[in-house]
Amino acid sequence: MTTPELPEGDIPTNWGRWGADDQFGTLNFITDAVRARAVAAATAGRVVSLAFPVTPVPLAGPVPFGASPAPAAVLQVLSYNGSPARAITDVLLLNTHHVGMTHIDALVHLPAGDQVYPGIPLSTAVSLGRVTHGSTAAFAAGITTRGVFLDLAPGDQLDSGHEVTGRDLDEAEARAGSRVESGDALVVRAGWRVSHELTEAVPAMTLDAVLWMADREVSVYAGDIGDRPPVPPGGPMIMHQVALPLLGMPLIDGPDVSALAATCTELGRHDFLFVVAPMAVTGATGLPVNPLAIF
């Protein structure tokens, strides 16, 4: 596997910004003051989930690994204990980065060449089958911050192949009436559901849009678009290539933002308390999540 080439040009990084061994990246922008401001945004008592439901598929044969060949994001083996059963248990096999799973990417997920954030050699971060730097350990305390929702195509969807720029984000921000500030989570809607069945070119974030997020000091990104699925494999994945290894910005892939869009329209506001509390699993490259927007 080779890492796709980054576009030419001066791309800023956060390497060294919070120390040579930092593992939190842009989550460092979430200060106590940011959390307090976020909690103050929860005034109506409404809770909206940003996760797609996943139905497990019974495991009945060899396990195909990778994002594409797996029959589902979750495979399940049920265990009936006794007859009559005193308890029913199961084992779940999670294909974390499956396109059908709402999940968060750890910073180690995509390296820049032979380094991961913030300049740690890949051979040091991942060795002997274990991830020791840049893993999901950074999410053990959860993510609590203010979220801002930007709808790039209210009531519609972006055109196929649209390349999202900072100007698109500026215009969506003006419509929302809520400014993205340091430490905020950015949630974006383009009106698409990425899947392996899609034959059209999915809209995608450009480098300009990612640099917009860096300039605003976004702590975490969640959107129904991000990178266009690379065809052929090895093609550019600008958002993942810049956000994860260079900026140290965690990405939430595959969220369901439809109910959030409807709620923002109903309440006439686009900011909320944003909470993500993944399992406290260390040493993984990502985890399934159920992000919550609390109004």
For the regions a language model picked out, list residue spans one by one:
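Active-/binding-site microenvironments in catalytic and ligand-binding cores
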Residues: M1-F295
